[in-house]
Every structure is written in structure tokens, then in C-alpha cells.
Amino acid sequence: MHHTLPFYGWHQHKFLRLYMFLIKLTRLPLVGSLGRYLANSYARSKHGGYLITLEDAEQIIDASNTLALGPCSCRQVFHNCNLPVMTEIVISAGREVYSKKSNKEFKQISKEEAKRILHQNHRSNVIHTIMHCQGLFYAICTCCSCCCVPYRLKKEYNIEYALIRNRNIVADYLKQLEEAEV
């Protein structure tokens, strides 16, 4: 596991606030395009999200060995709506990081419970994402368009790589699992 993911896990709320603070610089005339370029480069190579379907999320859950449920950090930090907060399903590399972070916030759940939570929240017209840090997928989050930081970065500030589609996301996740076993 890359050392960046544990560091990010411990300071996630601070990073989300920092992202939203710094991204406002992209609206300044002289530094805006440079800021947008840097943010897109960072999202592409270091940390960002993939928009996934409910079916993709279910396949990823089926392939995962351990799952944990915790609060959606975006919704926990920004409080822009009244949708449920307990919607982040930590997978794979993220499980180890977040279990060390706080056993009070994250609890281990079954695949059936994870799917039930996905379906329950899907009816609220939310978006499903899988997040990556340094190429490691670490969480499936079900968030809303008013709180989701990657969604807001893309829609409000034109940071295209903050949240992208990848038709091969399930295959990419399975490949990551295979490589972790070797």
C-alpha cells in the first residue's frame, strides 16, 4: 500500500476543506488556468474518483474480501443536505487504513448489507463513485451532487479529472486485487 493513502485517511476532512478552498483560485483571472491545470493533473495521477453505476458497485462489492461502512466525508464536512451520512463503503486497501483510523466511525459489514445500503441510497437519486489514491481504489461512496467534492470540482470548477467515467472500472479493480495477492 502506498504511504499516501494512510496519510490522506487520517487527514481527509482537512484535505476536503483545502481542496474546496484552493479550487476557488481557479476563478482568478491570472492564476485560474494554471490552478485548473494543476488540479486536473493532481486528480488524474494522485487522487480522484470514478463515477460508477449501481451494477458496477455491486460487482466491486462481490469481489471484495472485507468491507466497512463509515460516514461520507464530503457530507460530514459540508452538511449541504439531510441525506444519510453513513454511506461510504471502504474496500480493499482502504479497509486497513480506515480500521486503524477509528473503530468507532467504521464498522465491518457483509456484502449483503453493503448492497442493501447501496440500493437504499440509490432511491434518493444520489451518485455512486469509487475513489482512488495513487492508483489504489479505497472506497465506494454514495453521495449527493450538493456535497460530493469530486462532483462539485468537476461541475462548478471544470476540473474534468476529479470525477470521470471508466467503462473498465470493475476489471481495473479486479486487476488491483490480483496484484495485491501476488
What are these regions (language model features)?
Residues 69-84, 137-152, 179-182:
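Local cysteine-cluster metal-coordination motifs and their immediate loop/turn environment
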Residues 61-71, 118-140, 174-177:
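Immediate flanking context of iron-sulfur cluster ligation sites
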Residues 53-55, 126-129, 155:
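Glycine-rich, charged/polar anion/phosphate-binding loops
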Residues 131-135, 160-182:
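Ferredoxin-like iron-sulfur electron-transfer modules
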Residues 100-108:
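Hydrophobic protein-protein interaction segments
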Residues 77, 86, 107, 111-132, ...:
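Extended surface/linker regions that mediate inter-domain or inter-protein docking
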Residues 1-97:
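General detector of N-terminal leader/presequence modules that precede the first folded domain
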Residues 153-160:
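Short cysteine/histidine-rich zinc-coordinating motifs and their immediately flanking basic loops
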